[in-house]
């Protein structure tokens, strides 16, 4: 996992260079960010001698009890169709089989929250669908109904003082590449102002969480960043101090605090939100009372980044359960005159209500017999653009259009009812979405992996099952050709890690405490952006979880490795086939899979394949 983290950081090294080249004056608009991917991997495939693997003892993850209400489960798994429409009911074929895997006493820590929020989300979605149906039947379809996820929102000329004001509403949240540009003038008579990203309400909480609080204090110049939830209160403050060295930690290859401003200090806040005093060099402080500034807050893969007048000032890593897709509003308090604020690159779907959907973009019908390959694409609610890029690119391979290969998106519900309504429209239009009966959280990805195994053994039986992500490009032709040379059973195929250890650094996205995995290393596992298992392994996973012989684990790709290790020792020797043409972090010619591709790059790769018939990278 450490190798994976270094790869992610390397990717964003180019972003930081581009950020330093920005020239942002006092104006309303700033340049949007371009994420560029560069890595290197050589092409090599080999089959591993697994005799040593077979002899290792099986270790199961530690089991912790987490409970949810039966009422929520009963609602989510009631017999009636929520939608009453065959097209969307077909998107719940896995959903209907998931209950036994959710109500186990050793469920993943976030399962209860994910199910509670899914119940609220589903109730809201049913109301939205019924409201839209009434609007269509009465002929009163407004632009608001047709376009509920705008690609940008803006506001101008607001004089804020004292109480907190909602500056912008963000109907469908934020995603990687989104940015918020604010032009303002601090009040000469005020000692501070705050910019807050407020989230959708969490289950069981009456007050909305603060996904990010950016507190600017003039009395003793400071920039303090933090989060807040009703349940946990304020988290650990992160603030700059002029004297001392920087912490050796980066977010998207950017420092937590600009070296010219100071060093970062992390301390626990008191619940009364008292700002701790610190000393900063006034000369380097990016804000000045009475002087206008342009602030660009943008969203990377790992965290938030703030640029003031063209200079990167602070970064703040996303905290668990407080992801950017939860953000629903921008609030400002304190003394600040707002000249303009603009949120751009927001998640938007295609307007399915006004466009005639091309037949070639719809999921083709299947014969009902076992297919060669099922590809499960892990996606989240507001990643509309990514899914459309896949539908218009590698999902157009003849093997997919003919039904030899099936591709399905596995998506959990969203806490935002508008995003869920757009997903409902999307599912109805394309027929390639399988909904999950929980709200998407990183800690629940392993449940999606189990769901994919159910899909590939019970719903769309397939000889091979592949897991990939919605920012990956897959060469279906090369993959099928390679699988012809592989065994049809007891197979794990992809970019395999044979010597990795748990990340013990608290705060890391991949942090695993010793009580969850006490060993110093993991069994062999294939990197999550793309791996293939045989039908018998998928069947073993489903049966093992139904009978609760297999434990759940937070990291889905490592979890699959743990389950396969048990298959290897109890059922049949596994062939671990490592193929370095599965690029989990870069693009290199002669690839089978490349990860971290934007929608633009996905379409570019497809165009190059069509024109040149070669797997050539775009950048």
Curated annotation (Swiss-Prot):
Domain Galectin: start-end pairs: 166-344
Entry-linked Pfam families: Gal-bind_lectin (PF00337), Galactosyl_T (PF01762)
Gene Ontology annotations of biological process type: arabinogalactan protein metabolic process; mucilage biosynthetic process involved in seed coat development; protein O-linked glycosylation via hydroxyproline; root hair cell development
Listed InterPro entries: ConA-like_dom_sf, Galectin_CRD, Glyco_trans_31
Single GO cellular component term: Golgi membrane
List of glycosylated residues: 79, 217, 568, 613
Keywords recorded for this protein, A-Z: Glycoprotein, Glycosyltransferase, Golgi apparatus, Manganese, Membrane, Signal-anchor, Transferase, Transmembrane, Transmembrane helix
Topological domain ranges for the Lumenal compartment: 38-619
Membrane-topology annotation of the record: Single-pass type II membrane protein
Phenotype when the gene is knocked out: Reduced levels of arabinogalactan proteins. Root hair defects. Reduced seed coat mucilage. Increased sensitivity to salt stress.
Molecular-function annotations in GO: carbohydrate binding; hydroxyproline O-galactosyltransferase activity
Subcellular location: Golgi apparatus membrane
Family assignment from sequence similarity: Belongs to the glycosyltransferase 31 family.
Function: Possesses hydroxyproline O-galactosyltransferase activity. Transfers galactose from UDP-galactose to hydroxyproline residues in the arabinogalactan proteins (AGPs). Is specific for AGPs containing non-contiguous peptidyl hydroxyproline residues. Utilizes UDP-galactose solely as sugar donor. The addition of galactose onto the peptidyl hydroxyproline residues in AGP core proteins represents the first committed step in arabinogalactan polysaccharide addition. AGP glycans play essential roles in both vegetative and reproductive plant growth.
Name recorded for this polypeptide: Hydroxyproline O-galactosyltransferase GALT3
The gene coding this protein: GALT3
């Amino acid at each position: 996992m450490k190798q994976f983290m270094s790869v992610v950081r390397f990717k964003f090294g180019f972003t930081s260079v581009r950020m330093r080249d920005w020239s942002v004056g006092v104006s309303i608009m700033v340049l949007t960010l371009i994420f560029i991917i560069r890595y290197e991997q050589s092409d090599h495939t080999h089959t591993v001698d697994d005799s040593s693997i077979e002899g290792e003892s099986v270790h199961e993850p530690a089991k912790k009890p987490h409970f949810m209400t039966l009422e929520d489960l009963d609602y989510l798994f009631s017999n009636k169709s929520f939608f009453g429409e065959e097209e969307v009911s077909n998107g719940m074929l896995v959903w209907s089989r998931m209950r036994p895997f959710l109500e186990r006493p050793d469920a993943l820590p976030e399962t209860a929250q994910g199910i509670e929020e899914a119940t609220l989300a589903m109730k809201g979605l049913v109301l939205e669908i019924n409201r839209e149906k009434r609007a269509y039947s009465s002929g009163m379809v407004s632009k608001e109904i047709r376009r509920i996820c705008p690609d940008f929102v803006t506001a101008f000329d607001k004089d804020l003082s004292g109480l907190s004001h909602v500056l912008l509403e963000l109907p469908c949240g934020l995603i990687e590449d989104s940015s918020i540009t604010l032009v303002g003038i601090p009040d000469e008579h005020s000692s501070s102002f705050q910019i807050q990203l407020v989230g959708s309400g969490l289950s069981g909480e009456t007050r909305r969480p603060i996904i990010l609080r950016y507190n600017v204090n003039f009395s003793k110049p400071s920039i303090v960043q933090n989060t807040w939830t009703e349940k946990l209160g304020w988290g650990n403050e992160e603030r700059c101090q002029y004297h001392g060295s920087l912490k050796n930690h980066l977010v998207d290859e950017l420092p937590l605090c600009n070296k010219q401003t100071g060093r970062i200090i992390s301390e626990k806040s008191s619940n009364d939100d008292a700002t701790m005093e610190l000393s900063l060099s006034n000369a380097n402080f990016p804000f000045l009372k009475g002087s206008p500034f342009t602030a660009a807050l943008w969203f990377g893969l790992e965290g938030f980044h703030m640029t003031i007048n063209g200079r990167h000032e602070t970064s703040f890593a996303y905290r668990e359960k407080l992801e950017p897709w939860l953000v629903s509003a921008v609030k400002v308090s304190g003394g600040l005159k707002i000249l303009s604020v603009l949120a751009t690159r927001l998640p938007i779907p295609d307007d399915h209500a006004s466009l005639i959907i091309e037949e070639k973009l719809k999921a083709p019908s299947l014969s009902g017999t076992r297919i060669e390959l099922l590809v499960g694409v892990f996606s989240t609610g507001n990643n509309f653009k990514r899914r459309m890029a896949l539908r218009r690119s590698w999902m157009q391979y003849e093997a997919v259009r003919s039904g030899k290969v099936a591709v399905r998106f596995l998506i959990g519900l969203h806490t935002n009812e508008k995003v869920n309504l757009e997903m409902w429209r999307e599912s109805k239009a394309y027929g390639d979405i399988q909904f999950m009966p929980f709200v998407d959280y990183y800690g629940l990805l392993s449940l999606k992996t189990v769901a994919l195994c159910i899909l590939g053994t019970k719903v769309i039986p397939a000889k091979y099952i592949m897991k990939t992500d919605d920012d990956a490009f897959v060469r279906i032709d090369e993959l099928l050709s390679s699988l012809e040379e592989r065994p049809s059973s007891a197979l794990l195929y992809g970019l395999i890690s044979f010597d990795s250890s748990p990340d013990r650094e608290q705060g890391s996205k991949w942090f695993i405490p010793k009580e969850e995995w006490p060993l110093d290393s993991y069994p062999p596992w294939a990197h999550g952006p793309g791996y293939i298992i045989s039908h018998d392994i998928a069947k073993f996973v489903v049966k093992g979880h139904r009978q609760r012989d297999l434990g759940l684990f937070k990291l889905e790709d490592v979890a699959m490795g743990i389950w396969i290790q048990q298959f290897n020792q109890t059922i049949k020797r596994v062939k671990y086939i490592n193929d370095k043409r599965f690029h989990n972090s870069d693009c290199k010619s002669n690839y089978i899979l490349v990860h971290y591709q934007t929608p633009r790059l996905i379409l570019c790769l497809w165009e190059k394949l069509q024109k040149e018939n070669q797997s050539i990278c775009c950048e």
